[in-house]
């Protein structure tokens, strides 16, 4: 079987955990391929139990699935161990979680520099989570990062940490007037933490490719969303990695020709956390309604999400840059009881209309949404399990979004629960 990529098609928080959980029972491997604990997935089991995951793939909640934290992820060891303990304390079996030897470790100096930099930037700050993700990726690109495999060689680890802190301490002390970190203490602390995950370190590339050769199905799970991609997102208000489908191959070690299906997760309206342009953003009553009804608060940060109407411009853009083959539309139930539901079908910029993503951020900041008003529905749709169970106007809304997004809507979420899903098309079925 080929690999499947699952990506967010907006600014993150689209409901990727629900999609992974739905597919988990039919795949053998689930891989997290980028990001760190700056993003979170929420999974609600049929029992009503709620799990918030930040580093560990959502497939850990499905028995028998092997989960992998891929080489494209940056791992905070303390967060990893805390998340493992939280799952195990609730009876979740984590024995089949593996960690790529080539994933990078997020160090204390990354967090320190991230937090102090944001404070130093003041009103010009980007709005990071302050968890050290960006500085860790900076070290990766600068070839001075600490990788998971380094904990297996104490001497090399000590040498790398000492070399890194020769520079980092200069930054902390001389620029930001903070205390220097002791290399020996940093190494000692990391080695103590490593005792809790050393047995999970693996050659993930080899294992995943062997699994595909043997006919297994591998689900590649991205965090955040397309518009937060460092290359294709609303730069500079983006993350430091590639959540887009192209990042799945790089962040897992699976060749791109192995990937046959790209499942985009698309919320029935739009949200984003942090700074940056957001053409359809709502304020006052409409924004309050979506925020309250949709429970729009960040899993990782707890910050209230900015809310807006569905934006077909960014949906089409996501379809294009990811090669999306199918969409999973989530939170359709949140729109129930609205008289009309506006959908953004284009932008007006300086008096000119466009249906494409602006090339510059300054243009996007000036973009005014052009709306198409669709009739709403009043019925509670949370019990719908077939497409025909939906009210006619809800079906029309889905079909219109499918038409203007550029890919079929194969699944629809009508509530937070695993079973509150309508499957219109089996995305795991082989296609000609």
Curated annotation (Swiss-Prot):
GTP binds at residues 12-18, 40-42, 305, 331-333, 413-415. It catalyses: IMP + L-aspartate + GTP = N(6)-(1,2-dicarboxyethyl)-AMP + GDP + phosphate + 2 H(+). Plays an important role in the de novo pathway of purine nucleotide biosynthesis. Catalyzes the first committed step in the biosynthesis of AMP from IMP. It is found in: Cytoplasm. Coiled coil: none annotated. Binds 1 Mg(2+) ion per subunit. This is Adenylosuccinate synthetase. Substrate binds at residues 299-305. Keywords: Cytoplasm, GTP-binding, Ligase, Magnesium, Metal-binding, Nucleotide-binding, Purine biosynthesis. It comes from Mycobacterium ulcerans (strain Agy99). IMP binds at residues 13-16, 38-41, 129, 143, 224, 239, 303. Pathway: Purine metabolism; AMP biosynthesis via de novo pathway; AMP from IMP: step 1/2. NCBIfam families: PRK01117.1 (NF002223), purA (TIGR00184).
């Amino acid at each position: 079987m080929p690999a499947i990529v699952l990506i967010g098609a907006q600014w993150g928080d689209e409901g990727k955990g629900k999609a992974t959980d739905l597919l988990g029972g039919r795949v053998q491997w689930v891989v997290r391929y980028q990001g760190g604990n700056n993003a979170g997935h929420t999974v609600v089991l049929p029992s009503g139990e709620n799990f918030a995951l930040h580093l560990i793939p959502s497939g850990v909640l499905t028995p028998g699935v092997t989960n992998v934290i891929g080489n494209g992820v940056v791992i905070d060891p303390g967060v990893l161990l805390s998340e493992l303990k939280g799952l195990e304390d609730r009876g979740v079996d984590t024995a089949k979680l593996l960690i790529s030897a080539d994933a990078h470790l997020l160090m204390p100096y990354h967090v320190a520099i991230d937090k102090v930099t944001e404070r130093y930037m003041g009103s010009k700050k980007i709005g990071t989570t302050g968890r050290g993700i960006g500085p860790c990726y900076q070290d990766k690109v600068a070839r001075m990062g600490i990788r998971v495999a380094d904990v297996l060689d104490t001497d090399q680890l000590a040498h790398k940490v000492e070399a890194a802190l020769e520079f980092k301490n200069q930054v902390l002390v001389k620029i930001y007037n903070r205390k220097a970190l002791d290399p020996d203490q940093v190494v000692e602390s990391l080695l103590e933490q490593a005792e809790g995950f050393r047995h999970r370190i693996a050659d993930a590339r080899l294992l995943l490719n062997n699994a595909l050769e043997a006919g297994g199905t591998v689900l590649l799970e991205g965090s955040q969303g397309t518009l937060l991609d460092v290359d294709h997102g609303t730069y500079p208000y983006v993350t430091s990695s590639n959540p887009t489908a192209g990042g799945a191959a790089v962040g897992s070690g699976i060749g791109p020709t192995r990937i046959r299906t790209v499942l985009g997760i698309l919320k029935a309206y739009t949200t984003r956390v942090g700074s940056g342009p957001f053409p359809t953003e709502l304020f006052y009553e409409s924004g309050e309604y979506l925020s309250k009804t949709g429970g729009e608060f960040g899993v990782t940060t707890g910050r209230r999400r900015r809310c807006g109407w569905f934006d077909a411009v960014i949906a089409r853009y996501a379809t294009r840059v990811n090669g999306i083959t199918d969409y999973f539309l989530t939170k359709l139930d949140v729109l129930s009881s609205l008289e009309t539901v506006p959908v953004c079908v284009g932008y007006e910029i300086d008096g000119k209309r466009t249906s494409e993503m602006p090339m510059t951020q300054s243009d996007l900041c000036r973009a005014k949404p052009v709306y198409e008003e669709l009739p709403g529905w009043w019925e509670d749709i949370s019990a719908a399990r077939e497409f025909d169970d939906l009210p006619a106007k809800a079906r029309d809304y889905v079909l219109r979004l499918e038409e203007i997004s550029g890919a079929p809507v194969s699944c629809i979420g009508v509530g937070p629960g695993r079973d509150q899903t309508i499957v219109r098309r089996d995305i795991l079925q082989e296609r000609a």
